[in-house]
Amino acid sequence: MNVVIRVDASNQIGTGHVMRCLVLAKKLLERHHTVTLLSRELTGNLIDYCRQQGMTVIALPAIEDVVSPDRNDYQHWLGVSQEEDANQCLAALKNTPFDWVVFDHYALDTQWQSLMKCQGANIFAIDDLANREHNCDILFDHNPWPDFKNRYHAFVPASSQQLLGPKFALLRDSFASLRETRKEDIKNQVIAFFSGTDPTGECLKLLSACQQIPSLPFRVVLVYGMSNPREAELLEKPLPAFVTLVKSLPDFETELAHSRYAFGGAGVSAIERTCLRLPSTLVSVAENQREMAEHLAKSGLYRYLGVSDATTAAYYTNELAWLSEHWETLPWRLPESDIDGEGANRVVDAMEAASS
Protein backbone atom coordinates (compact mmCIF):
# COMPACT_ATOMS: atom_id res chain seq x y z
CA MET A 1 0.00 0.00 0.00
CA ASN A 2 1.04 3.58 -0.65
CA VAL A 3 -0.29 5.61 2.27
CA VAL A 4 -0.53 9.38 2.68
CA ILE A 5 -1.21 10.79 6.16
CA ARG A 6 -2.56 14.35 6.51
CA VAL A 7 -1.96 15.66 10.04
CA ASP A 8 -0.87 18.90 11.73
CA ALA A 9 0.68 19.98 15.00
CA SER A 10 0.81 23.53 16.34
CA ASN A 11 0.76 25.44 19.59
CA GLN A 12 -3.05 25.47 19.35
CA ILE A 13 -3.65 22.00 17.91
CA GLY A 14 -1.12 20.31 20.17
CA THR A 15 1.10 17.32 19.37
CA GLY A 16 -1.16 14.35 20.05
CA HIS A 17 -2.56 13.97 16.53
CA VAL A 18 0.93 13.73 15.02
CA MET A 19 2.17 11.36 17.72
CA ARG A 20 -0.59 8.81 17.17
CA CYS A 21 -0.17 9.08 13.39
CA LEU A 22 3.53 8.32 13.85
CA VAL A 23 2.57 5.08 15.59
CA LEU A 24 0.45 4.11 12.58
CA ALA A 25 3.13 5.25 10.12
CA LYS A 26 5.84 3.18 11.78
CA LYS A 27 3.61 0.10 11.84
CA LEU A 28 2.86 0.55 8.13
CA LEU A 29 6.58 0.87 7.36
CA GLU A 30 7.26 -2.21 9.45
CA ARG A 31 4.82 -4.07 7.17
CA HIS A 32 6.75 -2.80 4.09
CA HIS A 33 4.20 -0.22 2.95
CA THR A 34 5.22 3.29 1.86
CA VAL A 35 4.17 6.29 3.94
CA THR A 36 4.23 10.01 3.19
CA LEU A 37 3.17 12.61 5.76
CA LEU A 38 1.59 15.91 4.73
CA SER A 39 1.84 18.58 7.42
CA ARG A 40 1.50 22.35 7.36
CA GLU A 41 4.24 24.67 8.62
CA LEU A 42 2.30 26.09 11.55
CA THR A 43 3.94 27.57 14.64
CA GLY A 44 4.80 24.62 16.87
CA ASN A 45 4.78 22.05 14.04
CA LEU A 46 6.59 18.71 14.35
CA ILE A 47 7.82 18.42 10.77
CA ASP A 48 11.52 18.23 11.71
CA TYR A 49 10.74 15.81 14.54
CA CYS A 50 8.88 13.50 12.13
CA ARG A 51 11.83 13.56 9.74
CA GLN A 52 14.14 12.71 12.62
CA GLN A 53 11.90 9.70 13.21
CA GLY A 54 12.67 8.53 9.69
CA MET A 55 9.48 9.77 8.05
CA THR A 56 9.09 11.20 4.56
CA VAL A 57 7.31 14.52 5.13
CA ILE A 58 5.96 17.00 2.60
CA ALA A 59 5.56 20.42 4.22
CA LEU A 60 2.48 22.31 3.08
CA PRO A 61 2.96 26.08 2.59
CA ALA A 62 3.32 28.20 5.69
CA ILE A 63 0.49 30.59 6.42
CA GLU A 64 -0.11 33.32 8.93
CA ASP A 65 -1.33 31.45 11.99
CA VAL A 66 -4.91 32.31 12.86
CA VAL A 67 -5.17 31.54 16.57
CA SER A 68 -8.73 31.61 17.79
CA PRO A 69 -9.36 32.67 21.40
CA ASP A 70 -11.55 29.57 21.54
CA ARG A 71 -9.20 26.58 21.59
CA ASN A 72 -12.06 24.40 20.32
CA ASP A 73 -12.81 26.47 17.20
CA TYR A 74 -11.51 23.69 14.99
CA GLN A 75 -12.03 25.40 11.62
CA HIS A 76 -9.28 27.88 12.54
CA TRP A 77 -6.87 24.98 12.90
CA LEU A 78 -6.61 24.45 9.15
CA GLY A 79 -5.70 28.04 8.26
CA VAL A 80 -7.13 27.73 4.73
CA SER A 81 -10.37 26.42 3.23
CA GLN A 82 -10.81 22.67 2.92
CA GLU A 83 -10.81 22.99 -0.87
CA GLU A 84 -7.52 24.91 -0.85
CA ASP A 85 -5.97 22.42 1.54
CA ALA A 86 -7.03 19.48 -0.64
CA ASN A 87 -5.72 21.17 -3.79
CA GLN A 88 -2.38 21.90 -2.10
CA CYS A 89 -2.16 18.28 -0.96
CA LEU A 90 -2.87 16.98 -4.47
CA ALA A 91 -0.32 19.36 -6.00
CA ALA A 92 2.29 18.25 -3.47
CA LEU A 93 1.52 14.60 -4.28
CA LYS A 94 1.76 15.07 -8.06
CA ASN A 95 4.67 12.65 -8.31
CA THR A 96 3.73 10.45 -5.35
CA PRO A 97 1.47 7.45 -5.98
CA PHE A 98 -1.06 6.76 -3.23
CA ASP A 99 -3.99 4.43 -2.67
CA TRP A 100 -4.81 5.36 0.94
CA VAL A 101 -5.32 8.80 2.45
CA VAL A 102 -5.35 8.86 6.25
CA PHE A 103 -6.29 12.12 7.94
CA ASP A 104 -6.31 13.13 11.59
CA HIS A 105 -7.68 16.67 11.64
CA TYR A 106 -10.79 18.09 13.31
CA ALA A 107 -11.16 20.76 10.59
CA LEU A 108 -11.61 18.24 7.76
CA ASP A 109 -14.90 16.60 6.81
CA THR A 110 -16.68 15.04 3.85
CA GLN A 111 -15.89 18.05 1.61
CA TRP A 112 -12.12 17.49 1.83
CA GLN A 113 -12.45 13.71 1.82
CA SER A 114 -14.57 13.69 -1.34
CA LEU A 115 -11.94 15.74 -3.21
CA MET A 116 -9.27 13.22 -2.21
CA LYS A 117 -11.54 10.26 -2.96
CA CYS A 118 -11.97 11.52 -6.53
CA GLN A 119 -8.34 10.48 -7.05
CA GLY A 120 -9.33 6.84 -6.53
CA ALA A 121 -7.88 6.57 -3.02
CA ASN A 122 -9.36 4.83 -0.01
CA ILE A 123 -10.07 7.24 2.85
CA PHE A 124 -9.22 6.49 6.48
CA ALA A 125 -10.71 8.97 8.97
CA ILE A 126 -9.28 9.34 12.47
CA ASP A 127 -11.76 11.14 14.71
CA ASP A 128 -12.65 11.71 18.35
CA LEU A 129 -15.57 14.10 18.04
CA ALA A 130 -18.44 12.48 16.10
CA ASN A 131 -19.65 15.95 15.10
CA ARG A 132 -19.47 15.97 11.28
CA GLU A 133 -20.00 13.77 8.22
CA HIS A 134 -17.20 11.62 6.80
CA ASN A 135 -16.94 10.16 3.30
CA CYS A 136 -14.56 7.41 4.31
CA ASP A 137 -13.88 3.72 3.82
CA ILE A 138 -12.65 3.22 7.38
CA LEU A 139 -13.54 5.31 10.45
CA PHE A 140 -11.31 5.06 13.52
CA ASP A 141 -12.00 6.27 17.06
CA HIS A 142 -10.18 4.46 19.84
CA ASN A 143 -11.80 6.28 22.75
CA PRO A 144 -13.84 4.23 25.26
CA TRP A 145 -16.90 6.48 24.92
CA PRO A 146 -20.21 5.44 26.45
CA ASP A 147 -22.12 3.58 23.72
CA PHE A 148 -19.13 3.99 21.38
CA LYS A 149 -20.43 1.34 18.97
CA ASN A 150 -23.32 3.57 17.83
CA ARG A 151 -21.56 6.92 17.96
CA TYR A 152 -20.86 7.38 14.24
CA HIS A 153 -23.89 5.78 12.58
CA ALA A 154 -25.24 9.16 11.45
CA PHE A 155 -21.86 10.42 10.20
CA VAL A 156 -20.43 7.71 7.91
CA PRO A 157 -21.66 5.79 4.85
CA ALA A 158 -23.31 2.45 5.58
CA SER A 159 -20.46 0.76 3.71
CA SER A 160 -17.79 2.31 5.95
CA GLN A 161 -15.92 -0.02 8.28
CA GLN A 162 -15.75 1.33 11.82
CA LEU A 163 -12.76 0.57 14.05
CA LEU A 164 -14.13 1.72 17.38
CA GLY A 165 -13.01 1.38 20.95
CA PRO A 166 -9.72 1.09 22.84
CA LYS A 167 -8.74 -2.31 21.47
CA PHE A 168 -7.72 -0.36 18.33
CA ALA A 169 -5.71 2.25 20.27
CA LEU A 170 -2.61 3.42 18.40
CA LEU A 171 0.04 2.80 21.05
CA ARG A 172 3.76 2.29 20.58
CA ASP A 173 4.92 -1.35 20.56
CA SER A 174 6.65 -0.93 23.92
CA PHE A 175 3.30 -0.63 25.72
CA ALA A 176 2.37 -4.24 25.00
CA SER A 177 5.54 -5.57 26.63
CA LEU A 178 5.59 -3.05 29.49
CA ARG A 179 2.01 -3.98 30.30
CA GLU A 180 3.16 -7.52 31.07
CA THR A 181 6.21 -6.51 33.13
CA ARG A 182 4.77 -3.62 35.14
CA LYS A 183 4.59 -5.74 38.29
CA GLU A 184 8.38 -5.45 38.53
CA ASP A 185 10.38 -2.52 39.92
CA ILE A 186 7.54 -0.15 40.81
CA LYS A 187 9.05 3.13 42.00
CA ASN A 188 7.71 5.19 44.87
CA GLN A 189 6.76 8.04 42.57
CA VAL A 190 3.97 9.96 40.88
CA ILE A 191 4.57 10.91 37.25
CA ALA A 192 2.77 13.83 35.58
CA PHE A 193 2.43 14.77 31.90
CA PHE A 194 -0.20 17.09 30.41
CA SER A 195 0.36 16.89 26.63
CA GLY A 196 3.11 18.21 24.41
CA THR A 197 1.94 21.82 24.53
CA ASP A 198 0.15 21.92 27.92
CA PRO A 199 -1.92 24.95 26.81
CA THR A 200 -3.34 25.78 30.25
CA GLY A 201 -0.09 25.35 32.20
CA GLU A 202 -1.00 22.28 34.26
CA CYS A 203 2.65 21.36 34.80
CA LEU A 204 3.29 24.83 36.21
CA LYS A 205 0.22 24.59 38.47
CA LEU A 206 1.37 21.24 39.83
CA LEU A 207 4.90 22.52 40.43
CA SER A 208 3.47 25.53 42.28
CA ALA A 209 1.41 23.16 44.41
CA CYS A 210 4.49 21.10 45.25
CA GLN A 211 6.24 24.27 46.42
CA GLN A 212 3.50 24.78 49.02
CA ILE A 213 4.01 21.34 50.58
CA PRO A 214 6.92 20.67 52.97
CA SER A 215 7.18 16.96 52.14
CA LEU A 216 5.44 14.05 50.43
CA PRO A 217 5.74 10.27 50.94
CA PHE A 218 6.61 9.89 47.23
CA ARG A 219 8.64 11.58 44.50
CA VAL A 220 6.94 13.70 41.83
CA VAL A 221 8.33 13.47 38.30
CA LEU A 222 7.06 16.37 36.18
CA VAL A 223 7.47 15.78 32.44
CA TYR A 224 6.84 18.68 30.08
CA GLY A 225 6.63 18.43 26.30
CA MET A 226 8.96 19.72 23.62
CA SER A 227 6.43 22.40 22.63
CA ASN A 228 5.55 23.68 26.11
CA PRO A 229 5.40 27.50 25.83
CA ARG A 230 6.06 27.92 29.58
CA GLU A 231 9.43 26.15 29.60
CA ALA A 232 11.38 29.23 30.74
CA GLU A 233 8.98 29.81 33.62
CA LEU A 234 9.19 26.17 34.68
CA LEU A 235 12.99 26.24 34.67
CA GLU A 236 13.08 29.42 36.75
CA LYS A 237 11.13 27.91 39.64
CA PRO A 238 13.09 26.34 42.52
CA LEU A 239 12.39 22.62 42.81
CA PRO A 240 11.41 21.01 46.12
CA ALA A 241 13.66 18.11 47.11
CA PHE A 242 10.99 15.56 46.14
CA VAL A 243 10.40 16.95 42.60
CA THR A 244 12.20 16.08 39.36
CA LEU A 245 11.52 18.22 36.27
CA VAL A 246 12.24 16.59 32.91
CA LYS A 247 11.74 17.65 29.29
CA SER A 248 10.38 15.05 26.84
CA LEU A 249 11.65 11.85 28.43
CA PRO A 250 12.92 9.62 25.58
CA ASP A 251 11.88 6.50 27.52
CA PHE A 252 8.69 8.05 28.89
CA GLU A 253 6.57 4.91 28.69
CA THR A 254 9.15 2.96 30.71
CA GLU A 255 9.13 5.59 33.44
CA LEU A 256 5.34 5.61 33.27
CA ALA A 257 5.18 1.84 33.70
CA HIS A 258 7.50 1.95 36.71
CA SER A 259 5.51 4.68 38.48
CA ARG A 260 2.91 3.95 41.11
CA TYR A 261 0.51 6.77 40.18
CA ALA A 262 0.07 9.45 37.52
CA PHE A 263 -1.47 12.82 36.70
CA GLY A 264 -2.44 13.46 33.09
CA GLY A 265 -4.95 14.26 30.39
CA ALA A 266 -7.99 12.23 29.42
CA GLY A 267 -7.06 11.66 25.77
CA VAL A 268 -4.54 9.22 24.29
CA SER A 269 -2.39 9.44 27.43
CA ALA A 270 -5.29 8.06 29.50
CA ILE A 271 -5.50 5.09 27.13
CA GLU A 272 -1.74 4.56 27.53
CA ARG A 273 -2.05 4.56 31.32
CA THR A 274 -5.02 2.19 31.18
CA CYS A 275 -3.01 -0.19 29.01
CA LEU A 276 -0.33 -0.20 31.73
CA ARG A 277 -3.04 -0.52 34.42
CA LEU A 278 -1.63 2.62 36.08
CA PRO A 279 -3.95 4.47 38.51
CA SER A 280 -4.23 8.18 37.81
CA THR A 281 -5.90 11.51 38.37
CA LEU A 282 -7.38 12.91 35.16
CA VAL A 283 -7.52 16.50 33.94
CA SER A 284 -9.45 17.49 30.80
CA VAL A 285 -6.78 19.41 28.87
CA ALA A 286 -9.16 19.87 25.90
CA GLU A 287 -12.91 20.38 25.78
CA ASN A 288 -13.46 17.14 23.88
CA GLN A 289 -11.86 15.26 26.81
CA ARG A 290 -14.44 16.40 29.35
CA GLU A 291 -17.06 13.75 28.58
CA MET A 292 -14.41 11.05 28.51
CA ALA A 293 -12.90 12.10 31.85
CA GLU A 294 -16.31 12.19 33.51
CA HIS A 295 -17.15 8.76 32.08
CA LEU A 296 -13.88 7.24 33.30
CA ALA A 297 -14.25 8.83 36.74
CA LYS A 298 -17.72 7.29 37.12
CA SER A 299 -16.12 3.86 36.83
CA GLY A 300 -14.47 4.50 40.19
CA LEU A 301 -11.05 3.58 38.78
CA TYR A 302 -9.88 7.15 38.19
CA ARG A 303 -10.01 10.45 40.02
CA TYR A 304 -11.04 13.55 38.09
CA LEU A 305 -9.68 17.00 38.91
CA GLY A 306 -11.75 18.95 36.38
CA VAL A 307 -11.33 20.99 33.20
CA SER A 308 -7.88 22.52 32.82
CA ASP A 309 -9.28 25.98 32.07
CA ALA A 310 -10.69 26.00 35.61
CA THR A 311 -8.01 24.19 37.63
CA THR A 312 -5.59 26.09 39.87
CA ALA A 313 -2.54 25.21 41.93
CA ALA A 314 -4.91 24.77 44.88
CA TYR A 315 -6.66 21.90 43.09
CA TYR A 316 -3.33 20.09 42.85
CA THR A 317 -2.40 20.93 46.45
CA ASN A 318 -5.62 19.27 47.62
CA GLU A 319 -5.08 16.25 45.37
CA LEU A 320 -1.51 15.77 46.60
CA ALA A 321 -2.78 15.96 50.17
CA TRP A 322 -5.36 13.28 49.39
CA LEU A 323 -2.71 11.07 47.79
CA SER A 324 -0.42 11.50 50.79
CA GLU A 325 -3.20 10.46 53.16
CA HIS A 326 -4.10 7.35 51.15
CA TRP A 327 -0.68 6.48 49.71
CA GLU A 328 -0.10 3.30 51.70
CA THR A 329 -3.50 1.81 50.83
CA LEU A 330 -3.86 2.91 47.20
CA PRO A 331 -3.89 0.04 44.68
CA TRP A 332 -0.85 0.21 42.43
CA ARG A 333 -2.53 -1.56 39.53
CA LEU A 334 -5.92 -1.21 37.82
CA PRO A 335 -8.04 -4.23 36.85
CA GLU A 336 -7.44 -5.87 33.46
CA SER A 337 -8.79 -4.08 30.38
CA ASP A 338 -9.01 -4.90 26.67
CA ILE A 339 -6.32 -2.31 25.88
CA ASP A 340 -3.48 -4.72 25.18
CA GLY A 341 -1.16 -2.53 23.12
CA GLU A 342 -1.88 -4.41 19.86
CA GLY A 343 -4.23 -1.82 18.37
CA ALA A 344 -1.85 -0.61 15.65
CA ASN A 345 -1.53 -4.15 14.32
CA ARG A 346 -5.32 -4.48 14.17
CA VAL A 347 -5.62 -1.18 12.30
CA VAL A 348 -3.05 -2.13 9.65
CA ASP A 349 -4.69 -5.56 9.34
CA ALA A 350 -7.98 -3.80 8.51
CA MET A 351 -6.32 -1.54 5.93
CA GLU A 352 -4.59 -4.48 4.27
CA ALA A 353 -7.83 -6.49 4.17
CA ALA A 354 -9.69 -3.55 2.61
CA SER A 355 -6.99 -3.26 -0.06
CA SER A 356 -6.98 -6.92 -1.04
Report the location of each language-model feature.
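Conserved donor-nucleotide binding/catalytic region of nucleotide-linked donor-dependent transferases
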Residues: 303, 308-337, 354
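A donor-sugar binding/catalytic signature common to diverse glycosyltransferases
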Residues: 15, 22-25, 250-292
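Nucleotide-sugar donor-binding patch of glycosyltransferase catalytic domains
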Residues: 278-314
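Conserved nucleotide-sugar phosphate-binding/catalytic loop shared by glycosyltransferases and other
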Residues: 31-87, 306
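Donor-nucleotide binding loops and adjacent catalytic segments primarily
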Residues: 184-258
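C-terminal alpha-helical cap of glycosyltransferases
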Residues: 339-356
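A nucleotide-sugar donor-handling region in carbohydrate enzymes
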Residues: 135-200
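Nucleotide-activated donor-dependent transferases that construct or modify glycoconjugates
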Residues: 1-14
